[in-house]
């Protein structure tokens, strides 16, 4: 997929594939791993603030390179895996008192995985819309129901 294609959006309210990938990279570095670390190791410290929605425009995700963005995400994910593998008998039931209420370390970890899956679905949906817009005069019907 070219950078230009990765910038395509089905509508003004949707994110492009490039925006989703950069969001995942920022979340990998500033959200889940940080908040899981705080929950496991620094429960009395407040979680650092994040602004995932604002970062999309503030950090100009859609102006970035797809290749560099993917590499950044993959590199951050590798660091996260190394950190996770280094945990010794984490207590997944430890509770952090978030502003909205208690959350366990296991909840943060489960949400991290779920967040990935939600955005994988989002990328697939955007790619599907892009394909269907760009195959005209042909059709994807033969592939099956969406």
Predicted regions and their residues:
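A generic short-segment signal for beta-strand/edge and adjacent turn/coil regions
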Residues: 4-7, 38-41, 76-79, 87-88
